[in-house]
Amino acid sequence: MAAALPPMLLLLLLLLLHHPAAANPDAKRLYDDLLSNYNRLIRPVSNNTDTVLVKLGLRLSQLIDLNLKDQILTTNVWLEHEWQDHKFRWDPAEYGGVTELYVPSEHIWLPDIVLYNNADGEYVVTTMTKAVLHHTGKVVWTPPAIFKSSCEIDVRYFPFDQQTCFMKFGSWTYDGDQIDLKHINQKYDDNKVKVGIDLREYYPSVEWDILGVPAERHEKYYPCCAEPYPDIFFNITLRRKTLFYTVNLIVPCVGISYLSVLVFYLPADSGEKIALCISILLSQTMFFLLISEIIPSTSLALPLLGKYLLFTMVLVGLSVVITIMVLNVHYRKPSTHKMAPWVRKVFIRRLPKLLLMRVPEQLLADLASKRLLRHAHNSKLSAAAAAAVAAAASSSAASSPDSLRHHHLHQHQHQHHLQLHHLQRPGGCNGLHSATNRFGGSAGAFGGLPSVVGLDGSLSDVATRKKYPFELEKAIHNVLFIQNHMQRQDEFDAEDQDWGFVAMVLDRLFLWIFTIASIVGTFAILCEAPALYDDTKPIDMELSSVAQQQFLPDIDF
């Protein structure tokens, strides 16, 4: 076995040495014949007036990025070139049936096709792949390239936007009389191709759907030259996939905007209304900072999402102002603010019914009692005045000794009235007069007894008041003062509750107003985007074989 090993190694070595000699000698001979006297700098025409027809195609492999801020579209493409070179024609029978030959592209003439709207990087293809030579003289060269083309971004409907970008290719050196450009799928004299970009090897983007890829040929005349310069526009219409922005921007923004409505549902006594408003305002500001990092810095248009955020910030700002006004109404006191009759009529009687609010029965009872008390007070004052006049007339008409005795008693009681009147002055009774004025008491409450019993409403006391001793009359005045003070305090508390209820009605009123404004504003702004009503199906899922293999379900035959 060991003796047989060297002959086997020798045989293997001979086979390896014989393998290069087994290469296609016809292809080598063809390569030498075609390129031995070939000049790659000369345009491949037999006559100098002839035009080289270059057919151009674009095969999209991947949509790498669309930078909205820098307005740059980055794509991974294969740029297909096809033209005729009369020097590369041969008879396959003379070269062992060879019909195609792969040669390095650096060894042959290449059209200087560049990307006119280049934004960054190389204008031309930098990866020099091999070209395919056909025996008919046709040359096919399909190099890969990564282009960064400028794309004008329209941010009006962001994030429900559609963008149309283009890639303009043309010869940088030769005019239209030397090199004529046409699309590789162009037929007859039609300069437009509906599907101008090959999407068979396209990897679907996670952010954009491709709606259309038309191509169109143009001829442009420059001031320097009389000849036309042809170019081909490859247009790409993109529609944004909105799931990411809906979940991460739209939904939180809508939720925060509706929190501004709940500010008016929060009771004023909680003390957190202003804090909630400021927190919502700060959240809206944070969203503005996030969007400013995404959208391009342009003053030509305001993004749709920016409009909505601005709308919500206006609502939140108004809610802060209105909340301050509502709190001011809630904490008003009768000692500083007297409620106007129209306020009581509008905000306690009318608006609660329209706003579906239940008015407390105590407020309704207080309103009714105040109306009855007002009418009764006016009638009692009139009756008391009439009784006082009658008593004065009867006392003046009396001429009996008893009348004279009562007259002297009346003078004695009048002196006591003067003493009581002295108590009402600022120097008397430690400021009782000032306390009475604070709670709305009149001088009659401490003046003559007719006015005091006039408030009590008892007409019999008017006739018999002269029989009261001074101590009893003073006690009656003190009791009436305490009664008047307690009545004023009850009215003070009742009106304080009225201000609180008015603030509650204002909260409910603006709750409805802001709810309707938020709903209408949300739908009016966000539903403005035309992409929401566009039911055009993406063509990348239909034309891409890669997408069909990845996303379409397997079909068992």
UniProtKB/Swiss-Prot annotation:
Record's protein name: Acetylcholine receptor subunit alpha-L1
Secretion signal span: 1-23
Organism: Schistocerca gregaria
InterPro entries reported for this sequence: Neur_chan_lig-bd, Neur_chan_lig-bd_sf, Neur_channel, Neuro-gated_channel_TM_sf, Neuro_actylchol_rec, Neurotrans-gated_channel_TM, Neurotransmitter_ion_chnl_CS, Nicotinic_acetylcholine_rcpt
Coiled-coil region: none
Record topological domains on the Extracellular side: 24-244
Annotated membrane topology: Multi-pass membrane protein
SS bonds (residue pairs): 151-165, 224-225
